[in-house]
Amino acid sequence: ASSTMPSPSESAVLPRRVALHAAALALTPRWVWGQDATAQDWAGSECIAPSKPGGGFDLTCTLASQAIAKVRPAFAPLRTRYLPGGIGAVAFDRAATGRLDSHHALVAFSSGSLLNIAQGRFGPHPVDAVHWVATLGTDYGVVAVHPQSPFQTLSQLMQALRDSNQRMVFGAGGTLGSQDWMKAALLVRHAGKDPRHMRFVSFEGGGEAIKALVGGHINVFTGDAAEAMKAQAHGAKFRLLAV
């Protein structure tokens, strides 16, 4: 990560690359990919979202299913199965050790997951313990507040962080040190405060974090644009301050 502090006024938040890996590919050679794959090979396949429903991992599985259906319309739809736990740690451990209870499984991950793997937070498994299949796209961070929040702009939020002795509660689908946590930490640091003292609540996916924001349990959501747009499309009410 760069040591240069981006200015929130520039709406500069690091993009998150979303990737899929398939541990089953290395464990079950009979599962054929590419041009040689058949509908029978694909039967029973699923995409595992290592979170609760509604977040970026859920959306990644949806995109994967749509992509496969477009190029292989005869294949059975790719099912989505949710496996929360450690915001990806449980899914990675089971994929790396062949304990996914599925011979035909893709697992949605992000560059935030890779950061946790590099930091050793997903167990002792190396990054090449699984087979990385594809990158689906990029996503951008957002800063959002409750629709009745007094903050209408990011500048107002930053001023409140500078002036208030009462710390705000941030929340997102990421643990301490994750990319979602880093977004909140950048805001707090830019306001002249110590990020180590900020209040941050980790959720099992962005969907759960957005529910907490809408319910008034956190003050600021620092997640990703795709999960925010998906939540709004399903009726969630919140105010975006920055992308």
Question: PLM features: residue spans?
Answer:
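N-terminal secretory signal peptides
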Residues: A1-L14, V18, A22-L27
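Loop/turn elements at helix/coil->beta-strand transitions in domains of secreted/extracellular proteins
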Residues: S102-H104, Q166-R167, A236-F238
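A bilobed periplasmic-binding-protein/Venus flytrap-type ligand-binding module shared by bacterial periplasmic
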Residues: I48-K52, Y140-P150
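C-terminal lobe and pocket-closing loops
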Residues: A228-V243
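Flexible hinge/capping segments at coil-to-helix
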Residues: V145-Q166
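Secondary-structure junction motif
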Residues: L176-K183
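N-terminal (or domain-start) structured segment
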Residues: W33-V127, L176, G192-K230
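A structural signal for short loop-to-beta-strand junctions that line the ligand-binding cleft
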Residues: H104-V107, P124-V143, V169-G171
